[in-house]
Amino acid sequence: MASLTSGRLHVIGGGLAGSALATLMAEDGVDVTLYDQAEPFESRWTRGMQTSPESHKVSEPEIFYDPEGLVADFFARFPEIPGKLVRPAHGVLGLKRGRRKPAIVTLDEGLAHALVNRRSGPLMRAITAFGLWQKRYASEDSRVELPKGMGHAGIDPDDDRQNPGTYHRDGLAVLAEVLFSMPAHRCSNALLGRVMLPRIKSLLSKNHEPVFSAIDPIILNDIALPTLRDRFIRAGGSVAAWAPLGDIDSTSEYATDLLFGEDTQIVLKPDDAVVLALHPKQLCDAVPDIGFAPAPARRQTMAFEMRRPFAEPRCLFTSDDLVRAIYCNRRHIQVSLSSNVHLPSDGTADQFAHRIWQKCIWLSDQYLNLDLSARAENTNNQGCPKFSFVDAEAPFPELTPGLAALRFRLQPPWKNLFLCGDSFPAEYAPGPAAVFASVKQVRSQLQTFFAV
């Protein structure tokens, strides 16, 4: 590898993406400074359920889509971190339409592979495969079809986008909402197609490992991230905590100054590089010219405490009118609510939670063959386990069609500026896998930058 000691690297944002990238670059021999508005080396996952709803960290599901195993591969390079930090998770798509028999689709071998193979006969499978591949090349104005029965509060029931419902259309709409944390009717077909079918072999081959993974936040926060911090410091990196980014001064081609707080200025040399690994709102405040929409996606979730831990992580995605996803991991379940459900603002929270809990019991028994009621103990007077509501911003923008197209031609305004985070890898759904895909991409770009 070429020498990477020609300039300094300033990584702004000490979350999972910034911390991981800073550690790798420091071990590559680069002089790295990591800045954060609070304490660096913090994750978006929390140790427990009782956390502040104002924090966007609390909304992250512990089970996520990672068909390439990027998260596990990253942490596997550090022998100090237990391998059980990331475990395979069993994924199921459960669909019900009217009086018809429920469709239960196992997703472990791949999303596109599962949707194609549930069809009977080679002709139907070929037609389904071709239809999925077409979506990848659809125009950005083409939206995911919203079948009848999965209506959204903002959609006219007579709208042309309300198509006759089929299990296949239901499945695509459910996956769009789960993967992108946005109403399906606002998601572009091209965006969903690129994520489900990054390559043609996604249709023809199956994954040998489940495409969903589960992370243990306790191991992550208590072992993995402190390990990264220790390695970063030992490699010569420096930490600047409680340093909120104010602005970036520049010429037409290069960023020249970093302004932190009210009175701190960092002058950049011509061979210095800057990486922004920030929440979309902070990113847009720092670099208005990026053209990136600051509005983040939202996640409405509930969490229920369990008495007994789950032997293996599992998740269920469903076309139910209330519940969109159920994530079972450790001693609790996280419930992602449908995009057309609104959390109660009056005194009916207990009744609403009881309704969601009963729905989860029925769905888990129907599609996962799992008895949740036997695992719950700390019930209130209405037979509902201890719960918490979360109505929070996801740590990425809502990838509407125009913004999804922007990701393919997004260029930072200055040659020495790089962007790292969920939002930037064009063929990944926002989430942990996208974070580490972005870390890998930016690391390669930085190695090229410093080697010139």
Over which residues does each language-model region extend?
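Conserved flavin/dinucleotide-binding core of flavoenzymes
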Residues: 328-452
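Glycine-rich FAD pyrophosphate-binding loop
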Residues: 27-50
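N-terminal glycine-rich dinucleotide-binding loop that anchors FAD/FMN and/or NAD(P) in oxidoreductases
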Residues: 48-74
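Conserved Rossmann-like nucleotide-cofactor binding loop
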Residues: 17, 40, 281
